[in-house]
């Protein structure tokens, strides 16, 4: 029933994708709602810090300025069927875009296999 080491095999022709979206923290609820509207039922959220062209910012604490190199962001991880990819990316783009530096990034990659630990389900049924 469950695959053993070395027995992993592709699911029955299902193409799975992974979206990693880095967005502004205050937009999390809006992005989450937009993804749910297009049929995404599960996601993993992680608080992350980083910088790109935005290059951090300056904060003042007790009269002293500090350079903050890493900017707080939220990483949203979603594994989904290839058929939902375009709608999910579009939902993130429309919801997370402010037009200013620091809007974030979206990374899309292929997923070889997905398995639900509890049941052993594979592929799209495991998501």
Question: Positions of the model-derived regions?
Answer:
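Positively charged, small/polar-rich N-terminal and surface patches that mediate targeting and assembly
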Residues: 1-127
């Amino acid at each position: 029933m469950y695959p053993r080491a070395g027995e992993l095999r592709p699911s029955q022709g299902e193409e799975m994708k992974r979206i990693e979206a880095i967005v502004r923290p205050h937009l999390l609820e809006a992005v989450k709602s937009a993804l749910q509207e297009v049929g995404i039922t599960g996601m993993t959220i992680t608080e992350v810090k980083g910088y790109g062209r935005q290059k951090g910012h300056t904060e003042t604490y007790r009269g002293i300025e500090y350079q903050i190199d890493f900017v707080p962001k939220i990483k949203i991880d979603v594994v989904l069927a290839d058929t939902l990819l375009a709608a999910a990316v579009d939902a993130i783009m429309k919801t997370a875009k402010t037009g200013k530096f620091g809007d974030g990034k979206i990374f899309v990659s292929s997923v070889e296999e997905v398995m639900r630990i509890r049941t052993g389900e594979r592929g799209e049924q495991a998501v």
